[in-house]
Amino acid sequence: MIKLIVGLGNPGAEYTATRHNAGFWLIDQLAREAGTTLRDERRFHGFYAKARLHGEEVHLLEPQTYMNRSGQSVVALAQFFKILPDQILVAHDELDLPPGTVKLKLGGGSGGHNGLKDITAHLSSQQYWRLRIGIGHPRDLISESARAGAKPDVANFVLKPPRREEQDVIDASIERALAVMPMVVKGELDRATMQLHRN
């Protein structure tokens, strides 16, 4: 059963619309659906709400520590409420999936994602769930001829807003993720994964 859903992103209005904040977009939608408001909670170093989602009590968190310090926020809340790593779902932007794709998985490496890297270090475990929201990779935007010599600027890419057509399909993928949340919060994660990966 998932007791904590974390969305990763960077704090500040200048980052709100950037690809790296896809995790925040999901949490904002969940809070709206639950009719709750995230509030600044200093002891958790983030914006926090306790929500009732599909009959289950769930904690929602958006760390306000900047991406590479996300673990500080996650572990503060997890320790306070005695939440185990496998009861945590972290929603994050995923370079290795195209826009419009969203996948669930338990455990694994960070894939170069600094937020995941820090969460793993703070929890001393990789065994937490991830909701991977595809944003694509900058190499996908480079022409074949230019690709040979070009090194894609990942840092610049994730800190820019998606193009309109990308935003539309990312929004649609978040809607699909929201549709499986009843299963997720009830602990039916295998079923949720199958449904999400079928779409």
Curated annotation (Swiss-Prot):
Catalysis: reaction(s): an N-acyl-L-alpha-aminoacyl-tRNA + H2O = an N-acyl-L-amino acid + a tRNA + H(+)
Pfam families recorded: Pept_tRNA_hydro
Residues noted as binding tRNA in the record, renumbered to the chain: Y15, Y66, N68, N114
Record's keyword annotation contains Cytoplasm: yes
Site feature Stabilizes the basic form of H active site to accept a proton, where: D93
Purpose of the protein: Hydrolyzes ribosome-free peptidyl-tRNAs (with 1 or more amino acids incorporated), which drop off the ribosome during protein synthesis, or as a result of ribosome stalling.
Family statement drawn from the similarity comment of this UniProt entry: Belongs to the PTH family.
The protein's name: Peptidyl-tRNA hydrolase
Organism: Burkholderia cenocepacia (strain HI2424)
Gene: pth
